[in-house]
């Protein structure tokens, strides 16, 4: 089967930007324990099974420091250019510096395709 994943998240728990996964607890949305691990492009490739991944769109998952997330992602994904990846980055459009933030995001990667 061929797939384009239009919405996924990568993270490295050691970065401290996903505190909800550091000590997951069952709640109304379920048990996050299976997600409480690093998940990056290499893990995706190892766990995809028979799925032919034609492309992916990483959607911002670090609302606290989206610029740092984009810097990290471009480094992680640089080694996986064949994945045909794109980014939806975080920019708070209600802030006066939104244009500056968006310009910073776009300067970090030519693969920015959207804003969240």
Range-by-range predicted roles:
Residues 1-116:
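Helix-coil boundary/capping segments in enzymes
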């Amino acid at each position: 089967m061929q797939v384009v994943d239009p919405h996924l998240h990568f993270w490295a728990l050691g970065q401290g930007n996903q505190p909800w996964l550091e000590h997951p607890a069952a709640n109304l949305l379920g048990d996050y324990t299976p997600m409480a691990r690093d998940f990056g492009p290499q893990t995706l490739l190892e766990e995809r099974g028979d799925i032919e991944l034609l492309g992916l769109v990483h959607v911002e998952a670090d609302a606290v420091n989206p610029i740092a997330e984009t810097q990290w992602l471009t480094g992680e994904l640089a080694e996986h250019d064949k994945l045909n990846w794109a980014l939806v980055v975080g920019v708070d459009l209600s802030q006066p510096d939104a244009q500056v933030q968006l310009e910073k995001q776009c300067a970090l990667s030519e693969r920015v395709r959207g804003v969240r």
